[in-house]
């Protein structure tokens, strides 16, 4: 099953829950969490640790100078 199929199924399951405000808020939170996880699984996306990357990808610095400072630039590679 592809990620797009999973996303479409999640939308179809969560849409009926959006009949009340609290259910809608809950559905949106679940959907946004799913989208965040799907986004992190794409190589080259930013990350903070290996847990943000899927499969065999690891969170690595783009270049040595970018690893220094408060906001190091890291990508799933």
Curated annotation (Swiss-Prot):
<feature type="propeptide">
    <location>
        <begin position="22"/>
        <end position="40"/>
    </location>
</feature>
<feature type="signal peptide">
    <location>
        <begin position="1"/>
        <end position="21"/>
    </location>
</feature>
<keyword id="KW-0964">Secreted</keyword>
<dbReference type="GO" id="GO:0090729">
    <property type="term" value="F:toxin activity"/>
</dbReference>
<dbReference type="GO" id="GO:0005576">
    <property type="term" value="C:extracellular region"/>
</dbReference>
<protein>
    <recommendedName>
        <fullName>Teretoxin Tsu15.4</fullName>
    </recommendedName>
</protein>
<keyword id="KW-0800">Toxin</keyword>
<keyword id="KW-0732">Signal</keyword>
<keyword id="KW-0165">Cleavage on pair of basic residues</keyword>
<keyword id="KW-1015">Disulfide bond</keyword>
